């Protein structure tokens, strides 16, 4: 199953899995841009995805993607998640993979993940104990993207001073994933039991989604090749958007689907650590590919 898998990395080189994205998440296009800026030439990522799809699934990648049983429900579901459309008229249990609590339950035994609990606004004791024990946590939606409504909590009292939480949410252990003062995450892409590509996101915001795209190179020590780097801007329709939407992309997503900023620098990561990311990505992809979607626990949006 084609996946976009998000990791955090602490300054001490501890790796945490935080999220898995299904359908056609970003990743290949972003990697391609970082490859272009860093090496001055096009990557072969799209050809590799296509050849892997044909080798493993016997279909072109577009045909493979549209053969997924939940894909027709997932497209309107993503727009519903953004608050820009109705809940899909046709439901498929594969949508339950969008509930981050389900992801946590599914993967916490096989990958290091920040400790997470369901946030219950009526259970003040449980939330207080979690914040006291972890010192710093984040409150985030169980179903959502783009870091919408994400908040950093450092005191139990602040948890209950928040505006009423209208969406089912999680409390999650805060992981300090920063480099040179910038928030850092790594997006890895896997398909058909094979690792495809990875790149880094850098941001001045607490969450690094849709940040500055950065090429990843093996080496030592862990860090950026340039402390103060320039960036290059791109404004072109992504490969994913063309396949997913064709000519009918929603106007509100234009920034996400077209505009990217790429660092003229690389994130240097030791080779054994890169290997760990690749191995975990393949392991997670195999688990997802072999899931019986009809046996997934119900998601929060079904309750």
Which role fits each region the language model picked out?
Residues 1-24, 224-303:
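Conserved metal-phosphate-binding beta-hairpin within the catalytic cores
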Residues 8-9, 14-16, 132-135, 151-236:
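Phosphate-binding site of ATP-dependent enzymes
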Residues 14-16, 29-41:
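A short alpha/beta connector and helix-capping loop motif
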Residues 20, 83, 141:
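Residues immediately flanking
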Residues 21-29, 147, 201-208:
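Glycine-rich phosphate/pyrophosphate-binding beta-alpha loops
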Residues 24, 35, 39-60, 64-65, ...:
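A short, GP-enriched loop/loop-strand-helix hinge that lies immediately N-terminal to
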Residues 36-68, 202-242, 246, 285-288:
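Active-site "cap" helix and flanking loop/linker of ATP-utilizing ligase/carboxylase catalytic domains
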Residues 89-184:
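Active-site nucleotide/adenylate-binding loops and adjacent lid/helix of ATP-dependent enzymes
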């Amino acid at each position: 199953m084609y996946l976009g898998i998000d990791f955090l990395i602490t300054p001490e080189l501890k790796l945490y899995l935080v999220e898995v994205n299904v359908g056609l998440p970003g990743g290949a296009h972003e990697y391609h841009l970082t490859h272009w800026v860093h090496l001055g030439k096009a990557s072969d990522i799209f050809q590799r995805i296509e050849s892997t799809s044909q080798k493993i699934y016997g279909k072109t990648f577009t045909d493979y993607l549209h053969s997924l049983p939940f894909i027709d429900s997932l497209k309107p579901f993503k727009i519903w998640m953004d608050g820009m459309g109705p809940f899909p008229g046709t439901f498929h249990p594969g949508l339950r993979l969008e509930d981050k609590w389900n992801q946590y339950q599914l993967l916490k035994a096989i990958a290091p993940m920040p400790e997470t609990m369901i946030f219950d606004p009526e259970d003040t004791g449980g939330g207080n104990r979690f914040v006291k024990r972890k010192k710093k946590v984040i409150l985030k939606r169980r179903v959502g993207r783009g870091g919408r409504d994400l908040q950093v909590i450092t005191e139990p009292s602040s948890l209950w001073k928040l505006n009423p939480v209208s969406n089912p949410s999680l409390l999650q252990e805060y992981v300090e994933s920063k480099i040179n003062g910038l928030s850092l995450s790594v997006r890895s892409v896997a398909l058909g039991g094979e690792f495809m590509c990875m790149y880094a996101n850098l941001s001045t915001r607490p969450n690094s989604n849709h940040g500055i795209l950065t090429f990843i190179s093996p080496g030592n020590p862990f860090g950026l090749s340039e402390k103060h780097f320039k960036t290059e801007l791109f404004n072109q329709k992504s490969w994913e958007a063309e396949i997913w939407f064709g000519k009918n992309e929603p106007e509100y997503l234009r920034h996400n689907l077209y505009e990217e900023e790429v660092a003229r620098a690389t994130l240097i990561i030791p080779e054994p650590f890169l290997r760990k990311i690749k191995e975990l990505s393949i392991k997670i992809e195999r688990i997802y590919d072999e899931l019986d979607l009809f046996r997934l626990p119900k998601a929060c949006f079904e309750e």
